[in-house]
Structure formats: structure tokens, C-alpha cells
């Protein structure tokens, strides 16, 4: 993102991770509808997403904000690669953990985004076991979980910026993650690749599950870009 302030309202697309954004960025040069978007990779977690959104606002007017990336499935209907367009975002981070705060996207943006809808809940850590995911669904009835959306959209709402959230699943509700990625994060909360490699080397029987998660993540990123491309090509100029 350029450091110079813009006077032209921008369509801003916020990802958390480089892996989420990579297919979108590769398509930007070839697809004018994507080329007009300002893309930001915030880093993992609601606080980083909130700070990145505040920085976008400081850089100039925003026409709309699309918060997107990976999520975890909380129901049997959500399989790796599945998408949801969030009808509601439940903030279950920090003090809202027991009584989530509810945010709703811009109605016009939601209507333009032709895709499967559902509720998305934002939490403060990676859910690594089926039990954790099942318990969160029982408490919130959400279809998918992430770690960023609530932070970004809270800032957007305060500024009066219309927003939309789209998530693609990397894991199903009954699928445990190969490692506790919370324990493999660095001081900034981002997954440390070196720690992941060491964990794989010391737990080689988990390598197939790690490879499978990588394949699911690649599928989710591809499906997410395909959806965003179709959606943004119909966006009004």
C-alpha cells in the first residue's frame, strides 16, 4: 500500500496472511476489476486487522472494505474450500468472549455478493481440535470461525465505511489441526515457519496432515480469489 494519501475513494481488500492474498495479487494485473482494489495484508489477529483498517482510513477515503481470508468450519456442511459471505459477524474476542457482539455488513454489498451466506465468529486464538470447534458452534451457531474480521469491521463501522466479509474454509469441524499453531506463533502472533518445520521434524507422523492442510489452504485461497473476481467484476464503477 502506498504511503501517499489518496483523495479517490478506494475499494480496499484486507487479508490476514500472504498465503490468502497471493492468488488475488497474481490476478490483479490481468483483471481490471481487481486492479482497482487496494490490497492490504494485516497479519494474524483482530488487533492487527483493526490497525490495518485504521491505516487505510488514514491514507484516504474508502468506498468499501472487503475483509477476507481463511476460516475454520464449524458445521458439517462446511468442508475445505467452502465459502461463506457473512450475514453477521460475531465478535467473541477478549471481553466479548462469553457474550459476542454482533456486527452486520452493508446490505447493498451483501446483496451484490452472490454466494452462500452464514454467520462468522471471530475469536482470539486458533481452534485446533474438533471439541473446541463444536463447543464454539454450540455457543454461537456460527458456520465458520476466523481471527480478524471483527477487529477490522469494528473500525470500519465507527468510520461509517460499508463492509463485507468473505471466508474460505481450510478445515472442517471434525478435522483436528496437525499442531497447536498457537504454540508455534512468534511474539507478533504470526505462525513461525521455522517452528512449524521443527515441529514436523520432531513429529514426522503428522507430516501428512500438515501437507493436507496446505492443500486445503491452497484450495481455499483459489476459491476465494475466484469468488472475489466474479463479485468485483459486477461492482459498480
What function would you assign to each model-found segment?
Residues 26-237:
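Glycine-rich phosphate- or other oxyanion-binding loops that anchor nucleotides, phosphorylated ligands
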Residues 14-16, 40:
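Short hydrophobic segments within beta-strands
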Residues 1-3, 14:
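Protease-domain processing segments flanking chymotrypsin-fold serine proteases, especially trypsin-like
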Residues 12-14, 66:
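Conserved beta-strand elements of the Class I
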Residues 6-12:
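Extreme N-terminal starter segment of soluble prokaryotic enzymes
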Residues 17-18, 149:
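Helix N-cap/beta->alpha junction signal
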Residues 4-5, 92:
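Absolute N-terminal positional cue centered near the fourth residue
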Residues 20-23:
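Short, charged/polar "capping" segments at the starts of alpha-helices
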